[in-house]
């Protein structure tokens, strides 16, 4: 996108490290099996703030709280090693985090020719320029896991773009990271944090598989995973088709109309389930014109309660489920039937996914997002809890990169009510879906 590259200028990179040296007792952080399942995926977050909110803020003001933040989140400043790979990170063993205080990257940039409103009116894929393009490797032992990009616009407003390696944690974790950064900026005291590990997962780590009866339950390969060719120390996937991003903006009025259309007066259904069912059917119609319908979809949810909003979690809250449309043609079946399947007939594969990774000693390479058509529930994510000077962003969004060919759909809260639906799908499907959503539902 040459026209976008010219809009972004004065790019500067620097590093921020923890304010204090990490102690010897914290020098190594073990990844859970679910962390390693997610290692080829990356979370991209983007926030926009108006001029009056950020006026007078300098990069020093934005970086200063990070020193304290990284004391709390010390593993995030580390670098990935393998248990037989030495300081360079190479080798073929199970990855772990060496907490060596190497830091996170901070990116400063300017957009001198566009206001925030003008940028938001541009193509969705242009947003990628505001979030640093991050991949781990091929020098794995020297690759930062987090990039934070601050971009100032012609109007004086600013965007914050977070690139977060999914191996660190899910979208809720990434959101917590930024929310706590903002709290530290205004002087709020934060209790010591650390990357929580799931007890159900930790008991699998470093156990002898032959003596662990739990592992015997994994008899079949999970539908929610796709094994990919070994990637070595360059953690990226290669798509066979061109993928494209797009966002659907569903107002509260449109959401109410959709719920009423699908379920009538039975409002006990969850908006996420209805949105997923609607898009599943629409995409089945689009794909049915030239290929097979998606009969199995993956549902990813974050099992977060109120107690987790003030801790740094790993991926242990992630639940991975599949839904199969047996003996029905998805493009013809009533949307309410698909809603019922998603709400009541999901098969939780989280445990067998973790067990599979443990059996393979954490070294095999899989994808989750895009192995099947994948729906991600971020309705409860606190993305609008990030406040600067007491003001919320005018727009916030999360997306996933490193997505398989089947695509991913994220459902997020919308500031004014309703939902934002972010799509990463094969380019051919995007146009067909946009047309059907516009014609049948009036949603753009």
PLM-predicted stretches and their roles:
Residues 2, 38-39:
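Position-driven detector of the extreme protein N-terminus
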